[in-house]
Design a protein with these regions (language model features):
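Canonical Radical SAM [4Fe-4S] cluster-binding loop centered on the CxxxCxxC motif
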Residues: 1-30
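Flexible, glycine- and charge-enriched loops at secondary-structure boundaries
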Residues: 25-32, 119-123
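Conserved AdoMet/S-adenosylmethionine-binding subsite of the radical SAM
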Residues: 40-179
Length: 181
């Protein structure tokens, strides 16, 4: 089950979920109890498949208190995954490290110039947070999304990013090409 949060620190040129950036839109607001009641309809499936909830966005690591409260409701049997840019303060990652089971990290590109041109921000926080997760033994719980973004990076750039990430200890990648307008 995917839960999308509103708000993101990045302004990617081809945002895959631009409604998460809109100040108004068609959003259903849930508190933790309401969300739990809604998604627990799938609990038998979660337990049989080792599944759970993926928090995406926007940026889920800007919603730490909500995720912490949700974990208390669902217990340790459900897997909690965050689909994140990791472009948040380190403290946000530290606060949830014992709560989050898996990470899907949209790295964009390891080259800071490419990353900044595409997102409007530098990738220093991303790399710091990624190193922290690896140091804490989470490398096997991380899938890195390494997109080819037309007009921003090349196949060579993606290859180089993957090589650098492998050197850091990452083994799981989701390589794909953005469909651009």
């Amino acid at each position: 089950t995917l839960v999308a949060f509103h708000g993101c620190p990045l302004r990617c040129k081809y945002c895959l979920n631009p409604t998460s950036l809109q100040p108004d839109g068609v959003w259903e607001r849930y508190d933790c109890n309401q969300l739990y009641e809604e998604v627990r309809k799938d609990e038998l499936y979660f337990l049989a498949s080792c599944g759970g909830v993926t928090f995406g966005g926007g940026e889920p690591l800007l919603q730490n208190e909500f995720i912490r409260q949700f974990r208390q409701l669902c217990g340790p049997e459900w897997r909690i995954t965050v689909e994140t840019s990791l472009n948040v303060p380190l403290q946000n990652v530290e606060e949830l490290i014992s709560i989050v089971d898996n990470y899907i990290v949209d790295i964009k590109d390891m080259n800071n110039d490419i990353y900044q041109r595409y997102t409007g921000k530098g990738n220093e926080r991303v790399l710091c947070n990624l190193r922290y997760l690896i140091e804490e033994g989470k490398a096997g719980k991380i899938i890195i999304r390494t997109p080819l973004i037309p007009s921003y990076n090349t196949e060579k750039d993606v290859d180089y990013s993957i090589e650098l990430l492998k050197e850091m200890g990452i083994t799981q990648f989701d390589r794909f090409t953005y469909k651009t307008p």
